[in-house]
Amino acid sequence: MAEVRARVDFKVGAKSNIDAEILSFRGLKTDKEHVAVIFKQADQTQDTPLVRMHSECLTGDVFHSSRCDCGEQLEETIQRMGESGGVILYLRQEGRGIGLYNKIDAYRLQSQGMNTYEANNHLGFDDDLRDFTEAAQMLEALGIKKIRLVTNNPKKIRELAEYGIEIVEVVNTSAHIKDGNENYLRAKVSHGKHNLKV
């Protein structure tokens, strides 16, 4: 059974001005170092907190890549939760689970005209290798059973529900369109069935 290992105060956001806590876990299904970032002690003060499962994206979250909208989605969520509370489950699932180097290989194929899913398939991977069991384990360790899920991705909704988490509302993020990510976002809508207006 998963449990919280450590809970530490820190400040987050583009200007490091939003109070939050970062939590580590023990007893998760794998040895990946997933973390939770909690705003306004939402796990203890809210019956149905906002929750976002955000898969690690070094290129988008850290380097603000033009190829995706991951960093913008993360920052939008941090701002929203900084105001109203919530929980970000930051999952170490780079490139929809294929890993950083394979994602860079997929970028090369995307530069040659493939979309994000075609590139992953060409490299021998399924569309999405992520498993959200550990996200459910993290929520259980926090005592959270009902949530308002921040996502555009139907797979996340479906899998969390399968793991027994009650989703009372789905809150979509904005479409963060910029020069370089239009094809990526269109593929997420047409192929991944994401709820985005692009």
Swiss-Prot record:
Active site: D128 (proton acceptor), R130 (nucleophile)
Species in which this protein is naturally found: Vibrio parahaemolyticus serotype O3:K6 (strain RIMD 2210633)
Pathway: Cofactor biosynthesis; riboflavin biosynthesis; 5-amino-6-(D-ribitylamino)uracil from GTP: step 1/4
Reactions this protein catalyses: GTP + 4 H2O = 2,5-diamino-6-hydroxy-4-(5-phosphoribosylamino)-pyrimidine + formate + 2 phosphate + 3 H(+)
Protein family per UniProt: Belongs to the GTP cyclohydrolase II family.
Binding site for Zn(2+): C57, C68, C70
GO biological process: riboflavin biosynthetic process
Name of the protein in its database record: GTP cyclohydrolase-2
HAMAP family membership: RibA
Gene (UniProt): ribA
